[in-house]
Amino acid sequence: MSKHRADVPLSDVRTLLEVPLWEPFDIDDEGRILAGYDGGGTTQLVEIAADGQLTELTALSGRCSGRYLVAERAVVVQHDLNGNENTQLSRLDLDVERVGPASEHDLDPLVYDPEFMHNLVDVQPGLVVFTTNRRNGVDFDVVTVDCATGQQTTMYAGGGYVADASLSPSGREVAVTCLSAQPCSTQVTISVDGGVAPITDPADHALHTGVAWLPDGTGLLMSSNHQREFRGIVRVRPDGTWAWLVESDEHDLDVYPSPDGVALLVVRHDDGATRLAIHDDDGRHVRDVELPADGVVSVRWAPRSDRVVLGLTAPRVPGDILALDVSTGTADVVVSSSSGAPDGMIDKLVEPTTHRVPAADGETIPCFVYRPPSDAAAEGVRGGVVFNLHGGPEEQAQRLFNPVVQAMVGAGLTVVVPNIRGSTGYGKRWYSLDDGRLRLDAIADLLALREWVPEVGGDPERVALYGASYGGYLVLAGLTMQSHAWRAGVDIVGMSSLVTFLENTPEYRRALREREYGYLDVERQFLLAASPITYLEHLAAPLFVIHGANDPRVPLSESEQIKAALDGAGLACELMVFDDEGHGLSRRENRLEAYPAALSFLVDRLGVPVPE
């Protein structure tokens, strides 16, 4: 599962895109790891035995993920069709002898209706727990399916967008986390015997995540910023008693309790990186966990509570799987993405520096900066700059591996990766500063960043915008509302009009997005004022657009309408559409077509010689 080619320049984006990535999905009671591996072009299931032996389990037509079924040699596979996100759940028996990995024909449908979503939430002995919008296409229910009989039981049908669900130890109750009417807020309820009891206030502007039952079923454990700026770890009883276990005045915390309830793995979010520590069940600190790099981790406990499987990505770690010994706090590499990289490539990858940039209104904008190894600014020559803008908006830029960013740096560009207002990871106040009619303040942050780029050797007259999803919207907003400021833009699956986006996105998505951007029936005029397409006559910089034809979040029409308008005005715009993709590019063959073209577009417009 590896390829080696010596002395490849960092600017070779194709080689960077071909570095295979690992991610962990589950671990069973024998220590076998169910992993995702994209060496074949899309993420497929691979089993890593306790002795390190690798077995390829699937070779589906598109990406997939999965979990082990408890006490069985089988997995439940989650898969969709060409990125449409209508996920289906199938069973794959591992004791059946096959010639090679399984295709779709080898899967036994467990939950199947291609018109709707079935999102895998959890596995319990004999059961799979999932959420689905099949009842009306809008509201999500929580359902269990008996793995032996196929019988399905609806545990929650109270409406709304269900973000997560946790089945109680008795199996009679389910704790449901739904998005509430407030932006970036959730409500937690307990559903039992057809009734729903609130645990948190639906009117509270607070985010509650990672809800898990205590092993004895007497309460819940969660991460929450209820009446707080940053999320802490709290134990909540059904009678409304809250007991804070771990708190921080500077960082959001997440919690992953061990299956036996004895230990808590606490994740601290620290300026785009995650720090780990083990605490006891009352929140007392036991030990810190040493990681091989400052990056971002995913977490899955072993059933015996003695180990944790971690996925790690960092600027110089494309995607590794680690095994954490809870008794020592030591995390050892199980499989490494670097084994599939050309010789010397990992050593050339660039670490970012961290900065705070003053905004026009006195706020400060956190950002990372990736600078070329041979910095021309040291000799008094300012270089081209790309702003890489994250999606969401209720997300954050993090310290992770991005092959396109690394290739930009290798081509001689400085890359600024900001967390403008509205980003998570820096407290409730910061992520609330772009809500509703504050949207234009977030766009104004782009100009503050542009004025600042000379501080890191950048030329403010040679800055391009690059972003996906909400980041793509920011690209279009900057190019149309601040047309004097930008040399070029790359928009990936971005919204060109908040009005047509809300009108055409699926109903379940509209309810989710209106709480952030504004409601069509009462705020249409403001939504028009915040839409890039309203100012299209001001656009002067060339634009490069990438979109998946099956995008269920931001419809392809958002890119098609801006392409048509620019063509009609005789302005430069290239649109690449991929018929087998959705909200982003999941297939390596498509990434190899789109991203080198986007990089060539940028280095040409920013006056940087195209790498040989």
Predicted regions and their residues:
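An edge-strand/N-cap motif at the start of beta-rich repeat modules
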Residues: M1-T15, F25-A35
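Beta-propeller blade-edge and WD-like acidic-aromatic loop motif
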Residues: S2-P9, G39-E56, D80-L107, L127-T154, ...
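Conserved beta-propeller blade repeats
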Residues: E18-L34, S61-H79, L89, V111-T131, ...
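Flexible loop/turn segments at secondary-structure boundaries
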Residues: T42-T43, P183-C184, A206, E229-R231, ...
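Hydrophobic/aromatic anchor residues within beta-strands of the central parallel beta-sheet
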Residues: V142, I233, C367, V415, ...
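Hydrophobic/aromatic beta-strand patches that form the interior of the parallel beta-sheet core
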Residues: V188, H355, F387, V416, ...
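Cap/lid segment of the alpha/beta-hydrolase catalytic domain
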Residues: S337-R462, Y466-S469, L474-A477, L502-A511
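Active-site-proximal cap/loop segments of hydrolase catalytic domains
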Residues: I420-E612
